[in-house]
């Protein structure tokens, strides 16, 4: 098992998570005792204990006082916060994960974009005004796109959408910078922003779903053209 890590705790965390992912510690099984596991991984028991607590908070493990530590089925117990980890664990499946991420984001964003234009159209108009002086670069578009979604999610009347977006953030920021490196993708996005601004100024929230659906289809087609040339290391968290 080859693991790139920045310290003992990071190594231990990645070792355990990869072992769960590869079914060496299958769901429902009991982890080796603390002493045995710390020797196996090569870290102190104090470090291991901290790592186990963190993995339990993320849903990978169940820790109960006086009982052995049990491995969970993370698909049932974890949240969006493990997206980055899954991307790192499964580089071959990363393009599929991104497809699923973008599909989920498109479907959810149609709800909060409509809500924002209904409840806070002035906020939508204010942030969309930024498009008129925006630099034509991948970084500028990726940053604006995230800010737009974050602002409209918060203004939709249901701030829980912001928490969902936060779960996408790290992964989407890397994919977004790559996607918007295409001039054609930036043009497609700008056309969408301009139309959305028109709707916001007219408070025409009822027309948002059709616009979102059209942009979702077109940007999806654009992504299919771009994804085969994705950089090999785009799945890796630069901070992990």
UniProtKB/Swiss-Prot annotation:
UniProt-recorded Gene Ontology molecular function terms: DNA binding; DNA-binding transcription factor activity; fatty-acyl-CoA binding
Lineage: superkingdom: Bacteria
Alphabetical keyword list: Activator, Cytoplasm, DNA-binding, Fatty acid metabolism, Lipid metabolism, Repressor, Transcription, Transcription regulation
Coiled coil start-end: none
Residue ranges: DNA binding: 34-53
Chief location: cytoplasm
Annotated compartments: Cytoplasm
Domain HTH gntR-type, chain residue ranges per copy: 6-74
Any one Gene Ontology BP term: regulation of fatty acid metabolic process
One cellular component (GO) term of this entry: cytoplasm
Gene3D superfamilies: GntR ligand-binding domain-like (1.20.120.530), Winged helix-like DNA-binding domain superfamily/Winged helix DNA-binding domain (1.10.10.10)
Biological function: Multifunctional regulator of fatty acid metabolism.
Oligomer and partners: Homodimer.
Record protein name field: Fatty acid metabolism regulator protein
Encoding gene (name): fadR
């Amino acid at each position: 098992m080859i693991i790139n890590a920045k310290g003992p705790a990071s190594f231990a965390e990645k070792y355990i998570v990869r072992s769960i992912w590869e079914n060496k510690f299958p769901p429902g099984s009991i982890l080796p005792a603390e002493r045995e596991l710390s020797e196996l991984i090569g870290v102190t028991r104090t470090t291991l204990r901290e790592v186990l607590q963190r993995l339990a908070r993320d849903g990978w493990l169940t820790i109960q006082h006086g009982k052995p530590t049990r491995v969970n089925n993370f698909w049932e117990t974890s949240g969006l916060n493990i997206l980055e980890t899954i991307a790192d664990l499964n580089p071959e499946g990363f393009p599929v994960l991104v497809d699923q991420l973008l599909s989920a984001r498109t479907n959810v964003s149609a709800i909060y974009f409509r809500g924002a234009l209904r409840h806070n159209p002035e906020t939508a108009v204010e942030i969309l005004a930024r498009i008129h002086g925006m630099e034509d670069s991948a970084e500028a578009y990726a940053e604006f796109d995230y800010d737009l979604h974050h602002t409209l999610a918060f203004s939709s009347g249901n701030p829980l959408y912001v928490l969902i977006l936060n779960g996408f953030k790290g992964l989407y920021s890397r994919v977004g910078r790559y996607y918007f490196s295409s001039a054609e993708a930036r043009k497609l996005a700008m056309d969408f922003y301009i139309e959305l601004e028109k709707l916001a100024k007219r408070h025409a929230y009822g027309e948002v779903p059709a616009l979102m659906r059209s942009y979702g289809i077109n940007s999806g087609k654009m992504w299919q053209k771009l994804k085969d040339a994705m950089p090999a290391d785009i799945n890796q968290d630069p901070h992990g």
